[in-house]
Regions:
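Hydrophobic core segments of beta-strands in well-ordered, beta-rich domains
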Residues: 38-56, 95-99, 105-120, 127-129, ...
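Blade-level signature of beta-propeller repeat domains, shared across WD40, Kelch, NHL, RCC1
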Residues: 337-368
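Secretory targeting and sorting signals
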Residues: 1-23
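Conserved blade-ending motifs and adjacent loop-strand segments that build the rim/top face
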Residues: 257-269, 313-340
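Blade-loop segments of beta-propeller domains
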Residues: 61-64, 73-117
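Structural motif
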Residues: 57-64, 121-127, 176-183, 232-241, ...
Length: 368
């Protein structure tokens, strides 16, 4: 995806929208711009969600929402206001994470929020903020990566490796040998980051793996979902997965991984996300659902994939129905999923245009 175009369009206050379209189903999270939603369940049972939005003089902020009733309703409880993202300096693709164990001086339960900050006029960075009060207030922590040139760093994602280290995954455009690749760095304290290592990096310069999402399975194995763009043909930007036994070693970076598709050949392209149910079931969603021949499938914007263990992917209805999503930074773009503690329900947040504004909607449906 051309994320820099997205950032610049938002800074300019200009949104390219369809002429007329029915907005997504579900409830509105906020009644103005809400991009790149994320949702997590905390150890205390509360659900937190975040979106990127813009206020004032094109100030990019992270809006933090809380649900105390299993996702039936949300209330804004906090705001991440990074001065480096103020005055049109650019903000994109934020993530939200709760530490399940202490990392350095940060206790279990510390919240982390990170996003891509900057645009083409200065080196981009992945800036991390932390909260010790369940998302009410936030303070700057560190950068897990800073660009060495004017190319982009995108889509930060956190995980805790088997050895207890905090890992930051991201998409990197700064290497001339790769149009884009997936990278990871680790930290023992969340402040100092080290050992930048590729996780997905094609031997073809123009290939663009991106948008990593990492989850730990009940078995202890780690699973990463991502897209690979730049390949051309019907599988351009198709969704893939790969596994790691320890949350750091992901196999050969040049291997594309496993294509995410159903037994009858349907697959997702663009902006996939991944969720793991407590019972071990896996759920994925992508922006566009395609048929085996590459045509857009009838359930596009209204479908999730689910599978149990080593089974095959099958389709189920998506809680939020987005009408005919297409390759664009808003409709059904990187829609996060959260499965209930009993593994029976799934909460989805998905964005779509409403009267020319990209907004985020949420709803809950069956998880299988």
């Amino acid at each position: 995806m051309r994320r820099l175009v997205v950032v610049l369009a938002l800074i300019a206050g200009f949104l390219v929208t369809p002429a007329t379209a029915e907005a997504a189903t579900g409830q509105l999270l906020r009644d103005d711009t809400g991009l790149y939603p994320r949702v997590i369940q905390l150890a205390n049972g509360r659900i937190l969600a975040s979106v990127v939005t813009f206020v004032g003089n094109a100030d990019g902020i992270g809006a933090i929402y809380e649900s105390t009733n299993s996702g039936k309703s949300f209330t804004q409880v906090g705001t991440v206001e990074d001065p480096e993202a103020a005055d049109g300096q650019g903000l994109c693709c934020a993530t939200l994470f709760e530490l399940p164990k202490p990392v350095g001086a940060m206790p279990a339960g510390t919240l982390l929020w990170a996003a891509s900050v900057g645009a083409s006029d200065r080196p981009m960075s992945l800036r991390i903020w932390k909260s010790n009060d369940v998302g009410r207030t936030w303070s700057y922590l560190s950068n897990c990566a800073t660009a060495s040139n004017t190319s982009g760093l995108w889509e930060p994602e956190f995980s805790i490796a088997k050895d207890g280290q905090l890992v930051c995954h991201y998409a990197d455009e700064t290497d001339p040998a790769h149009s884009q690749k997936l990278m990871q760095v680790w930290s023992s304290d969340g402040v100092t980051w080290t050992d930048p290592t590729p996780t997905v990096a094609s031997t073809t310069v123009g290939h663009r793996p991106g948008m990593p999402v990492v989850r730990k399975l009940p078995t202890g194995t780690y699973l990463m979902s991502y897209e690979i763009c730049g390949v051309g043909g019907q599988y351009d930007c198709a969704a893939y997965t790969r596994q790691s036994a320890d949350g750091w070693n992901w196999g050969s970076p040049s291997a594309p991984g496993v294509l995410t598709r159903t037994a009858d050949g349907k697959y997702f392209t663009h902006a996939p996300t991944l969720a793991v149910a407590p019972n071990g079931n896996l759920l994925v969603v992508g922006q566009i659902l395609q048929n085996p021949d590459g045509s857009v499938a009838a359930g596009n914007g209204r479908t999730l994939f689910v599978k149990s263990g080593n089974g095959t992917w099958r389709t189920i209805p998506a809680p939020v129905a987005v009408t005919n999503p297409y390759n664009n930074y808003c409709p059904n773009y990187s829609s996060p999923l959260l499965v209930s503690p009993d593994s029976k329900r799934v909460l989805e947040l998905a964005s779509d245009y409403d009267a020319g504004v990209c907004k985020t909607y949420y709803a809950t449906g069956r998880a299988g």
